[in-house]
Amino acid sequence: MTKAIPKIGSRRKVRIGLRRNARFSLRKSARRITKGVIHVQASFNNTIITVTDPQGRVVFWSSAGTCGFKSSRKASPYAGQRTAVDAIRTVGLQRAEVMVKGAGSGRDAALRAIAKSGVRLSCIRDVTPMPHNGCRPPKKRRL
């Protein structure tokens, strides 16, 4: 019997260097700015923090999911605190305005973390959208 000739290239493409947390290695390094705007979006399921420069261009963003929290832990106040610390430490802000949107549990914890981080806050605004009796709200859950 003749021996099978080994194939030089395999059909299956192998991704080299991609790990489970590949997002962190593929992310561009954040610009360092001294003055900016911190947007805190606190929903009932997650907390998202976006840091922009004064013109509104996004410099860095972080969420409870990217900080390593999964499922219901993303909605915790501790996740909001860690998210805020991660965003500020990466960018290196010194002066900032804070805009808070939403009524999630990470909202107050994120504000406390921003205040304790040493960033000088010029103003804190609540920009939560409030309807003037617009759309009908969804029906209440029956458990």
Swiss-Prot record:
Keyword RNA-binding: yes
Keyword Ribonucleoprotein assigned: yes
Entries under InterPro entries matching the protein: Ribosomal_uS11, Ribosomal_uS11_CS, Ribosomal_uS11_sf
Top-rank taxon: Eukaryota
Record GO terms (molecular function): rRNA binding; structural constituent of ribosome
GO biological process, one term: translation
Subcellular locations according to the entry: Plastid, Chloroplast
Coiled-coil annotated spans: none
Keywords tagged on the record: Chloroplast, Plastid, Ribonucleoprotein, Ribosomal protein, RNA-binding, rRNA-binding
Assigned GO CC terms: chloroplast; plastid; ribonucleoprotein complex; ribosome
Subunit structure: Part of the 30S ribosomal subunit.
Family recorded in the similarity comment: Belongs to the universal ribosomal protein uS11 family.
Identification of the protein by name: Small ribosomal subunit protein uS11c
Lineage, highest ranks first: Eukaryota, Viridiplantae, Streptophyta, Embryophyta, Tracheophyta
Recorded name of the encoding gene: rps11
